[in-house]
Design a protein with these regions (language model features):
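N-terminal non-cleavable signal-anchor helices
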Residues: 7, 11, 78, 139-142
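Helix-loop segments that flank and shape redox-cofactor active sites
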Residues: 10-36, 101-110
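Long amphipathic alpha-helical segments
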Residues: 49-57, 129-144
């Protein structure tokens, strides 16, 4: 389950990369898109409380543990991609895969499945928006 928290963190970092590397005529649209994609509501808190505290009766991973795992995950997601929007799309795709794998686990209780469904729904919407933007005939966003 920590993989979901790590993948969300990576998506947030990638959205920040897009946010701060967008210039030119599409600046504001990309800026707003990046802000929207960072919003997973209370998903992280819900997972920590619903899964670790509620189901496992143990403390959730610390922010430090999540951040350390996210650093290497970030490097894997961005490998070979030089455009922030392509990186964000890769991060969202990875998050979707991670969540879908966990959703197939029948041993998880209904509350955890509901949390994963919410993350999955947001991920699907954000993936659609980012993919649509990446296919527009606009100047590419260059990373620095």
């Amino acid at each position: 389950m920590i993989d979901v928290l790590v993948a969300i963190e990576v998506v947030k970092w990638l959205a920040s990369d897009l946010h701060y590397n967008s210039t030119g005529p599409m600046f504001y649209a990309l800026h707003l898109l990046a802000d929207r994609v960072k919003d997973f509501g209370s998903a992280e808190d819900d997972l920590k409380e619903g899964y670790w505290l509620g189901c496992l009766d143990t403390t959730p991973p610390s922010d430090r543990e999540i951040a350390n795992a996210a650093i290497s995950a970030y490097d894997k997601v961005v490998d070979g991609k030089d455009c922030p929007i392509a990186r964000l799309l890769a991060g969202l795709t990875n998050l979707g895969v991670v969540v879908d794998e966990l959703k197939s686990d029948a041993s998880l209780n209904g509350g955890v499945h509901a949390i994963l469904d919410d993350i999955s729904n947001r991920t699907n919407v954000y993936t659609f928006l980012v993919r649509a933007q990446s296919q527009q005939n606009v100047p590419p966003v260059q990373s620095k």
